[in-house]
């Protein structure tokens, strides 16, 4: 059975994944699927670095603005949504291009993980109930002991990741469902960090503070509020930090997030990384995609 070919672009935040995805979509008749756990939420545009209206006009985007901020979203939800999007895109003769930085979501899709099938649901439920009795600290210690590093740490995601780790054989299909070309973008650490600092400054100038304040005042405890880009500004609203201090924390946490992203993809997935500073970029990637699409 022939597997559908898809392009997957990964890399740390602020490295230029969105721009490359749009360029490849234009060059190879593609449509973009967001692989970011936060971009599913409506009204959260700036802090999630969502493709702008102008960028979305250049290429069709899927899995953006599909949930209200009050709703939860998981790797399981993403896999179901992404599969439907891929099927839709392919049915119209176009190329699916996944762009994102949420490692667990992409791994779940590409390696065929699922919560169901042959897995004994009673066994899964028993393990889940056992995890629910643990404190947050105990959960995170268990994650660390198993070498699991999450893009964003919260209780729900910690439990889901431990389930995935515990039942890996039962949760993994016999065969990966797609034929992906993995494209990783990177650069020197100092360059990425400088790009992050500049992006945060631009976000603040574009209205991030107002977006974060709305989330803080309306929905401070929802899953969406725990994403990097929002919670770092909450201490400012609470009078516990100056705006300068909160902004500095946001930059620092985003830099740490970028480092974790790179570590995840290098350790968990077979990705060839290209430096965006190389003279061959992006032509070398265009050539690789062209060869990939011509392969039987």
Swiss-Prot record:
Cofactor(s) needed: Mg(2+)
Catalytic reaction(s) noted: adenosine(37) in tRNA + dimethylallyl diphosphate = N(6)-dimethylallyladenosine(37) in tRNA + diphosphate
UniProt keyword terms in alphabetical order: ATP-binding, Magnesium, Nucleotide-binding, Transferase, tRNA processing
Binding site for substrate: 13-18
Site location (Interaction with substrate tRNA): 102, 128
GO MF, one example: ATP binding
GO biological process, one term: tRNA modification
Binding-site residues, ATP: 11-18
Entry EC number(s): 2.5.1.75
UniProt region (Interaction with substrate tRNA), positions on chain: 36-39
Known role: Catalyzes the transfer of a dimethylallyl group onto the adenine at position 37 in tRNAs that read codons beginning with uridine, leading to the formation of N6-(dimethylallyl)adenosine (i(6)A).
Family membership noted in the UniProt record: Belongs to the IPP transferase family.
Subunit note: Monomer.
Protein name (database record): tRNA dimethylallyltransferase
Organism this protein belongs to: Streptococcus equi subsp. zooepidemicus (strain H70)
Organism phylogeny: Bacteria, Bacillati, Bacillota, Bacilli, Lactobacillales
């Amino acid at each position: 059975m022939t597997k559908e070919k898809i392009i997957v672009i990964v890399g740390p935040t602020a490295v230029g994944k969105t721009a490359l995805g749009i360029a490849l979509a234009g060059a190879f008749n593609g449509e973009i699927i967001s692989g970011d756990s936060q971009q599913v939420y409506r009204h959260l545009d700036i802090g999630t670095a969502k493709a702008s209206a102008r960028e979305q006009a250049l290429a069709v985007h899927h899995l953006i603005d599909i949930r209200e901020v009050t709703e939860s979203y998981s790797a399981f939800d993403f896999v179901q949504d992404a599969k439907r999007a891929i099927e839709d895109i392919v049915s119209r003769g176009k190329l699916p291009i996944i762009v994102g930085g949420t490692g667990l979501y992409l791994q779940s899709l590409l390696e065929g993980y699922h919560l169901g099938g042959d897995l004994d649901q009673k066994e899964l439920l028993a393990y889940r109930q056992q995890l629910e009795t643990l404190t947050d600290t105990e959960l995170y210690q268990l994650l660390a002991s198993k070498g699991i590093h999450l893009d964003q740490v919260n209780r729900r995601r910690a439990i889901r990741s431990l389930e995935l780790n515990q039942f890996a054989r039962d949760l993994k299909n016999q065969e990966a469902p797609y034929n992906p070309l993995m494209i990783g973008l990177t650069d020197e650490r100092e360059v990425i960090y400088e790009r992050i600092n500049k992006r945060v400054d631009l976000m603040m100038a574009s209205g991030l503070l107002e977006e974060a304040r709305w989330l803080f005042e309306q929905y401070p405890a929802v899953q969406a509020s725990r994403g990097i880009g929002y919670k770092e500004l909450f201490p400012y609203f609470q009078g516990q930090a100056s705006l300068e201090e909160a902004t500095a924390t946001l930059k620092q946490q985003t830099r740490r997030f970028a480092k974790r992203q790179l570590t995840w993809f290098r350790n968990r997935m077979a990705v060839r990384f290209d430096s965006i500073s190389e003279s061959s970029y992006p032509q070398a990637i265009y050539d690789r995609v062209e060869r990939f699409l011509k392969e039987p």
